[in-house]
UniProtKB/Swiss-Prot annotation:
One of its GO terms (cellular component) is cytosol. It comes from Methylococcus capsulatus (strain ATCC 33009 / NCIMB 11132 / Bath). GO terms for molecular function: 4-hydroxy-tetrahydrodipicolinate synthase activity. The gene is dapA. Pyruvate binds at T45, I203. This is 4-hydroxy-tetrahydrodipicolinate synthase. InterPro entries: Aldolase_TIM, DapA, DapA-like, Schiff_base-form_aldolases_AS, Schiff_base-form_aldolases_CS.
Length: 291
């Protein structure tokens, strides 16, 4: 089981929107050096929605190649068509991903039975560890604990990224799932308490810019060291908030550019961080000691 701080990696782009391959390789090395426990490539923060299928697979391939077995790579392969999710998952497996993260189908708002059949179909079609991803604030679809419990019985479905921010869900899901089923927070603001309450880690936006602190916070929280975990988290609280001052990944890409790690590149309909928001993010970075 992967535990700890799992970065939801931003996808570096050149100012004209093309993929920045050297920048991507540089970010992977940065996370390995900083102690990040695993990388999610082309999730929400990786702008999966604006990458075409070839680019999607290429980013995963490049991250796997650069990681070279030193850190697990989880590929974002969710889609709102089951056939597409199967195809993306198969392609991720073919280029060496260790696991896949599949967001619930978005926009078309499936029923709970539809969600069950969707994930079952992917698990039956592609033999790779599969992590469910529930983020109703983006998808318009909330996967309920009972559905997670059903899916946890399916071979190959190994965990969930639960991004509602509802801490009570941790106990509800844990009670319905077999031992060893991984529960990851998808909400940086509540991740510390999530891990202190028995969660296995966080798939994090904040970890893009403060990877060492996020890893240390997760390690302490999973070990039950509340004092240490909360002390570290206090340094991160402003980042947890201000990296969402505009839609993710707008602020985090600006922050990474401010750190000199990536170029000033993002794809429409996302735009570069508004000037009026920059000082708040800059101050949050200073509070965390990353600027």
């Amino acid at each position: 089981m992967i535990q700890g701080s799992i970065v939801a990696l931003a996808t570096p782009m050149e100012p004209d929107g093309r993929l920045d391959v050297p920048g991507l390789r540089r970010l992977v090395e940065f996370h390995i050096e900083q102690g990040t426990d695993a990388i999610v490539a082309v999730g929400t923060t990786g702008e999966s929605a604006t990458l075409d299928e070839e680019e999607h697979t290429e980013v995963i391939r490049l991250v796997v190649e650069q990681a070279a077995g030193r850190i697990p790579v989880i590929a974002g392969t969710g889609a709102n068509a089951t056939t597409e999710a199967i195809r993306l998952t198969a392609r991720a497996k073919a280029v060496g991903a260790d696991a896949c993260l599949l967001v619930t189908p978005y926009y078309n708002k499936p029923t709970q039975e539809g969600l069950y059949r969707h994930y079952l179909a992917v698990a039956e079609a592609v033999d790779i560890p599969q992590i469910l991803y529930n983020v109703p604030g983006r998808t318009g679809c909330d996967m309920l604990p009972a559905t997670v419990g059903r899916l946890a019985q399916v071979p190959g479905i190994v965990g969930i990224k639960e991004a509602t921010g509802k801490l009570e869900r941790l106990a509800e899901i844990r009670a319905l799932c077999p031992e060893g089923f991984a529960l990851y927070s998808g909400d940086d603001a509540t991740a510390c308490e999530f891990c202190l309450s028995g969660g296995n880690g966080v798939i994090s936006v904040t970890a893009n810019v403060a990877p060492r602190l996020m890893q240390e916070m997760c390690r302490a929280a999973i070990a039950g060291d509340r004092a240490t975990a909360e002390a570290i988290n206090r340094r991160l609280e402003a980042l947890h908030h201000d990296l969402f001052i505009e839609s993710n990944p707008i602020p985090v890409k600006w922050a990474l550019h401010e750190m000199g790690l990536i170029q000033e590149g993002i794809r429409l309909p996302l735009t570069w961080l508004a000037a009026s928001c920059r000082e708040a993010v800059r101050q949050a970075m200073r509070q965390a000691g990353v600027l």
